[in-house]
Curated annotation (Swiss-Prot):
It holds the Pfam family Mur_ligase_C. This is UDP-N-acetylmuramoylalanine--D-glutamate ligase. Its EC number is 6.3.2.9. InterPro entries: Mur-like_cat_sf (IPR036565), Mur_ligase_C (IPR004101), Mur_ligase_C_dom_sf (IPR036615), Mur_ligase_cen (IPR013221), MurD (IPR005762). Belongs to the MurCDEF family. The keyword Cell cycle applies. It is an enzyme of class 6 (ligase). The lineage of its organism: Bacteria, Pseudomonadati, Pseudomonadota, Gammaproteobacteria, Thiotrichales. It comes from Hydrogenovibrio crunogenus (strain DSM 25203 / XCL-2).
Length: 449
């Protein structure tokens, strides 16, 4: 008998999948206050429990389907493992049943963007594409979807990969590694190891050029991507091909799309595009497909999204910047495009991360860093004291940034932290930032967003 543990979106997708397969199961949510009444109506044949695992179930459970938010290190989960119970996740169930080519993407930053780019390119080439995992719908919902998909494109988090063992992919990538989720992992190496499992059974590993530097072991069959510039790149390398003095995205000696044709300019956007091209290598897509996608793709919400330009100041929502690596990348990318400097708004739940790298970026590129939220004082200890100011709330941070910013500057909201001290998630947090910008800046003088 299966136990579905965790009844959020992922757990509910597992219940739906089991119902479609006629598979009996138990269902547990470890939150004592969780209301199961609606789920009990939807799944009358399932026994539900909240809080702790009922002792009468223990001898009947062969396999636990663990939601990503529940760690395998939880005492009750470890006890079940020690008793010989299989512990898997929804992605493992998906892998066992998919039966179609899968492209899988993980990394500390850029996962959603690259996943979307790959999906858009394959759709443009005529494939029916199912997109899910850590983006959009849970992966198992793709299997019960009425569309008969030709290929699946999955964004996967380290939490999902912890409980995935038999995923076979036509192409897979670890886009990058930077410290994240140190409140869940004992060491950075554990986080890296979880990410690396995505490459265990792939036909094509797509890796950044600096993968050895970030501690990733070399797999067997691979292509690499990075910002090398050459008239002809080495075999199986994606980068910037120089042609008649112009920079093109391409591979080896093939110039595919001129950099100037991209709707999004900036080095990290070029890296995302190159990763997308490399992941599409098994499908042999045309240059015309790549160019159309990159000409029209303007980015995802809450990811270095310009929400207002007024009086020479650019206001940017990067609420999805939930770790130090993402925020440093955003600062560096945006600073390239400015005549002035960056005013950074950051803070929230720091997840026990090391913020020294952020401190270096603040020194080099920021006029000021405004910190708010639960861990602002902890973060402040690792940043240059002459460049930081502390406030309690995001609204206060926006008002303060307004007084500091000068023409040519950008106010970058890239928290480098999780959101759940003051917000439900990064989306609610980003929407709040945009609302404050409209309220305090745009509406005050009739600016246009």
């Amino acid at each position: 008998m299966y136990l579905v543990a965790g009844l959020g979106l992922t757990g509910q997708s597992v219940l739906n999948y089991f119902a479609s397969q006629g598979e009996p199961c138990y269902a547990l949510d470890t939150r004592p206050e969780f209301d199961t009444s609606e789920l009990e109506k939807a799944y009358p044949d399932v026994a539900f429990a909240t809080g702790t695992l009922p002792t009468q179930w223990c001898g009947k459970i062969d396999s636990i389907v663990l939601s990503p938010g529940i760690a395998k290190s939880e005492p009750w989960v470890k006890h079940c493992i020690n008793q010989g119970t299989e512990v898997i996740g929804d992605i493992e169930l998906f892998a066992r049943a998919a039966g179609k080519p899968i492209v899988a993407i993980t990394g500390s930053n850029g996962k959603s963007t690259v996943t979307t780019l790959v999906a858009e390119a394959l759709k443009e080439a005529g494939y029916a594409v199912g997109v899910g995992g850590n983006i959009g719908c849970p992966a198992l919902d793709l299997l019960t979807h009425p569309t008969e998909f030709d290929v699946y494109v999955l964004e996967l988090s380290s939490f999902q990969l912890e409980t995935t063992y038999s995923l076979q992919t036509i192409a897979a990538t670890v886009l990058n590694i930077s410290e994240d989720h140190m409140d869940r992992y004992l060491a950075l190496e554990d986080y890296i190891q979880a990410k690396m499992t995505i490459l265990n059974n792939t036909e094509l590993a797509v890796l950044p050029l600096d993968f050895e530097r970030v501690g990733i072991a070399r797999p067997g069959d691979e292509v690499r991507f990075g910002l090398n510039y050459a008239e002809a790149l080495p075999p199986k390398e994606y980068g910037i091909v120089m042609k008649n003095g112009q920079a093109w995205l391409g591979w080896e000696d093939h110039a595919s799309v001129p950099v100037t044709a991209m709707a999004q300019q900036g080095l990290h956007h070029q890296l995302n595009a190159l990763a997308m091209m490399a992941l599409c290598r098994p499908f042999d897509l045309s240059d015309a497909v790549f160019e159309k996608v990159l000409k029209t793709f303007k980015g995802l919400p809450h990811r270095t999204q310009v929400v207002l330009e007024q009086e020479g100041v650019r206001w940017i929502n990067d609420s999805k910047g939930t770790n130090v690596g993402a925020t440093v990348t955003a600062i560096e990318s945006i600073k390239e495009t400015l005549d002035g400097q960056v005013i950074l708004i950051a803070g929230g739940v720091g997840k026990e991360a090391d913020f020294n790298e952020l401190g270096q970026a603040v020194v080099q590129s920021c006029r000021q860093a405004i910190l708010f939220g639960q861990d602002k004082a902890i973060i402040a200890q690792q940043l240059p004291q002459e460049k930081i100011q502390l406030v309690d709330t995001l609204s206060e941070a926006v008002l303060l940034a307004k007084t500091i910013a000068k023409s040519g500057d950008a106010v970058l909201f890239s928290p480098a932290c999780a959101s759940f001290d003051q917000f439900k998630n990064y989306i609610e947090r980003g929407n709040a930032f945009e609302a404050f910008v409209q309220q305090f800046i745009a509406n005050e003088v009739g600016g246009k967003s």
